[in-house]
Amino acid sequence: MAARLCCQLDPARDVLCLRPVGAESRGRPLPGPLGALPPASPSAVPSDHGAHLSLRGLPVCAFSSAGPCALRFTSARRMETTVNAHRNLPKVLHKRTLGLSAMSTTDLEAYFKDCVFNEWEELGEEIRLKVFVLGGCRHKLVCSPAPCNFFTSA
């Protein structure tokens, strides 16, 4: 069974943030009105929150009180941002954030479809989420397939 994720829009960064949902939750939560994020509170989420869940492939930052820093997605059909205005993930983002100078945008998207959409997204692949913003994460993924090891930053 795939992990349950909560999708929230962060208007300050124009990204969709995927956050793990507790096993006791029901349905597909979308807290507050679209675009609203609950105020960040370090004490709101215990450091071991979600440790009982089986979330294969989530980075080690997934359960921090700030939420996972690598699981940020933009939807090219739903919003306009600096990144998706160019229709492709800039190659500089590969090099700076992921250290993947030899990896093409197509390869990166295919990898994410396999690793993210097929494993994490509850209802399967979501075609409209095609452009990925992976700015700044310095955490390793802890998933099973060996290819995930290249998600350490250079």
Curated annotation (Swiss-Prot):
Entry keyword set: Activation of host NF-kappa-B by virus, Activator, Apoptosis, Host cytoplasm, Host G2/M cell cycle arrest by virus, Host mitochondrion, Host nucleus, Host-virus interaction, Modulation of host cell cycle by virus, Transcription, Transcription regulation
Keyword set includes Transcription: yes
The organism's place on the tree of life at top rank: Viruses
General function of this protein: Multifunctional protein that plays a role in silencing host antiviral defenses and promoting viral transcription. Does not seem to be essential for HBV infection. May be directly involved in development of cirrhosis and liver cancer (hepatocellular carcinoma). Most of cytosolic activities involve modulation of cytosolic calcium. The effect on apoptosis is controversial depending on the cell types in which the studies have been conducted. May induce apoptosis by localizing in mitochondria and causing loss of mitochondrial membrane potential.
Pfam family, one: X
Disulphides: none
Keyword Transcription: yes
Name of the gene: X
Example GO BP: viral genome replication
HAMAP family xrefs: HBV_X (MF_04074)
Coiled-coil regions listed in the entry: none
Subcellular location: Host cytoplasm; Host nucleus; Host mitochondrion
Region called Mitochondrial targeting sequence, residue ranges: 68-117
Gene Ontology terms: cellular component: host cell mitochondrion; host cell nucleus
Record note on quaternary structure: May form homodimer. May interact with host CEBPA, CFLAR, CREB1, DDB1, E4F1, HBXIP, HSPD1/HSP60, NFKBIA, POLR2E and SMAD4. Interacts with host SMC5-SMC6 complex and induces its degradation. Interacts with host TRPC4AP; leading to prevent ubiquitination of TRPC4AP. Interacts with host PLSCR1; this interaction promotes ubiquitination and degradation of HBx and impairs HBx-mediated cell proliferation.
UniProt record similarity statement: Belongs to the orthohepadnavirus protein X family.
Protein name: Protein X
Species assigned in the record: Hepatitis B virus genotype B1 subtype adw (isolate Japan/pJDW233/1988) (HBV-B)
